[in-house]
């Protein structure tokens, strides 16, 4: 069953003219500079009012050509491993560089120390293995904790607090590790939890209470606490007052720095995927349209999560006169984007614009079936469009072998 997308639909692209839309190749990703800046202003305001530091989780959005747009607003980057950490260091050398990985590789760790300022470990065993080297290199060291507090509904695949989770250390696991290795606490500078996914601040408040209940004895000894990501801070209606109360409470109670590392919040509603109808057909009672984009290749979360992305000038199935199932051109039978309704029938050559396509798209797409990677364009704050990067046959071929 598809999860209904809770993100707000968009009513239009104010800065994009019909002429520019006509010139865009399809499929293509179109990043929106003005919306990136609007998101940045919101996140900067939270930092200014609370003293927290907000990082960009590059796993969600790593289009480094627009890092200069975000640079005035962010404190640094968060990485999931060596390559993202290097990207953050290369493109934002003056900003903080944080990294968390479920398990680090010994053959990569020395290089990682060149890029990261803060290194968060997932388990006491990883802390014991790599912590001394990180400490000797002058890094700030953290441990990801599992407060065993699930607040998610509808997409348990993203719940790090699910039973048997591999992510984070429970209090029982920590106590057992310290009993066997009393030197571990001296390595720690901070704690990190990441339990949310596209959620409001009420879920954070519940989670924070669980963190304090289970780990209160450790917090006064820490220098920082990282609230992780999954905070939909820039979504209309998000409870900023609740978020800021949570941050200020921790800072005042424990005298420590607070970090947040959202990914989606930086680029929420700041990108589009422009596509063209290749064919229309009917199977029984179902009207279908084949697009030149693929859910499986270009928007994997549509299938993985799953969710139904917003589409400009379209309604829910049955809401408007003509309901159509939109799908991609690959051989995967489930390469379906969703059912939408329109005021008029779709025709070959029609252009469609999906919204909120900056996040978890360009960083997750693939070339299954030999599908080309869409080029990435930028809609500038001045209303002009320009291509940031173009992909071709060699990008497909050279992922699969060498000449």
Regions found by a protein language model. Name each.
Residues 18-24, 190-194, 228:
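A short small-residue
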Residues 5-104, 108, 294, 342-348, ...:
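N-terminal capping/small domains of soluble enzymes
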Residues 149-151, 197, 233, 266, ...:
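Feature marks short, surface-exposed loop/turn motifs that line or immediately flank catalytic pockets
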Residues 246, 257-403:
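Charged (often Lys/Glu-rich) extended helix/loop segments that serve as interaction or gating elements
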Residues 57, 194-196, 225-234, 262-265:
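Glycine-rich beta-strand-to-loop/alpha-helix junction loops that act as flexible
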Residues 49-224, 246-249:
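Active-site-proximal beta-alpha core segment in soluble small-molecule metabolic enzymes
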Residues 205-210, 239-245, 275, 341:
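Charged helix-capping and loop-helix junction motifs
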């Amino acid at each position: 069953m598809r999860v209904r997308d809770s993100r707000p639909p968009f009513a239009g692209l104010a800065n994009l003219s019909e002429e520019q839309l006509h010139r865009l190749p399809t499929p293509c990703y179109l990043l929106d500079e003005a919306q990136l800046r609007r998101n940045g202003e919101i996140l900067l305001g939270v930092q200014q009012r609370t003293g927290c530091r907000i990082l960009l989780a590059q796993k969600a959005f790593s289009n480094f050509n627009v890092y200069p747009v975000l640079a005035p607003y962010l404190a640094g980057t968060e990485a999931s491993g060596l390559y993202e950490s290097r990207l953050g260091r290369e493109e934002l050398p003056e900003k903080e560089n944080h990294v968390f990985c479920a398990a680090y590789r010994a053959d990569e760790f020395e290089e990682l120390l060149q890029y990261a300022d803060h290194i968060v470990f997932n388990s006491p065993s990883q802390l014991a293995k790599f912590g001394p080297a990180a400490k000797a290199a002058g890094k700030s060291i953290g441990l990801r904790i599992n407060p065993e507090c699930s607040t998610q509904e509808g997409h348990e695949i993203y719940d790090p607090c699910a039973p048997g989770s591999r992510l984070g250390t429970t209090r029982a696991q920590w106590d057992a590790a310290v009993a066997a290795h009393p030197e571990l606490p001296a390595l720690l500078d901070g704690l990190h939890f990441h339990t949310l996914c596209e959620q409001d601040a009420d879920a954070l408040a519940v989670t924070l209470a669980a963190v304090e209940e289970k780990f209160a004895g450790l917090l006064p000894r820490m220098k920082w606490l990282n609230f992780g990501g999954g905070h939909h801070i820039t979504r209309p209606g998000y409870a900023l007052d609740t978020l800021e109360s949570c941050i200020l409470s921790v800072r005042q109670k424990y005298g420590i720095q607070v970090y947040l590392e959202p990914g989606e919040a930086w680029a929420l509603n700041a990108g589009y995927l422009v596509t063209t109808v290749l064919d229309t057909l009917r199977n029984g009672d179902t009207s279908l349209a084949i697009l030149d984009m693929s859910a499986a290749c270009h928007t994997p979360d549509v299938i993985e999560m799953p969710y139904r992305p917003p589409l400009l000038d379209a309604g829910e199935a049955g809401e408007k006169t003509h309901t159509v199932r939109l799908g991609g051109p690959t051989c995967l039978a489930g390469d379906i984007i969703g059912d939408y309704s329109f005021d008029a029938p779709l025709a070959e050559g029609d252009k469609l614009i999906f919204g909120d396509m900056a996040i978890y798209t360009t960083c997750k797409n693939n070339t299954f079936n030999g599908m080309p990677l869409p080029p990435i364009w930028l809609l500038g704050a001045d209303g002009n469009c320009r291509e940031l990067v173009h992909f071709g046959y060699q990008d497909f071929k050279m992922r699969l072998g060498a000449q």
